[in-house]
Amino acid sequence: MSVSPIEAAVGLAIFGSIAAIAIPTFSSTVHASRLTEATEGLATIAANTVAQAAGKSPSEAFPTSVPLTPANVPRGHAEVDAPGIWDAPTWKAVDFRASPEGVPHWFSFELDSNASPNVSSFVTHAHADQDGDGLTSTFEIHGHDDATGATIEPGMYVEKEVE
């Protein structure tokens, strides 16, 4: 049984329609799963940073700042970390590492804390260059500690989320 040109054209049109729907959906799903790494990572860091502040004065509430880890943001692909990169005292204090040892990840993370006698604050950042063009996405969660206690501020700052 041979296929007529009209049947072939209809089959090709159906295949093209399915591909036109499936490919962008797949691409969006991949980007969303990568963004989960940043949002869940920052939520973990922020929650553990606030939990660590319980019962402490604002000047001692949060751990010291830790620089961007890894220092070079992964560019265009997920990377496996060097051994010991998450062993800094602050990362241990907030019980965080970007991924299990040997598992690649897309984002670099940082925790900046500022201590003062009455009000202390922190900002935790995540940065990635998912498309490898040299521009980075930025995700941030802010928190503070004062006389009322430590809290995570509502919302998340996001800039260039799919870079």
Task: Label each PLM-derived region with a short phrase.
Residues 106-117:
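Short amphipathic beta-strand and strand-loop transition segments with alternating hydrophobic
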Residues 129-136:
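Acidic, glycine-anchored loop motifs typical of Ca2+
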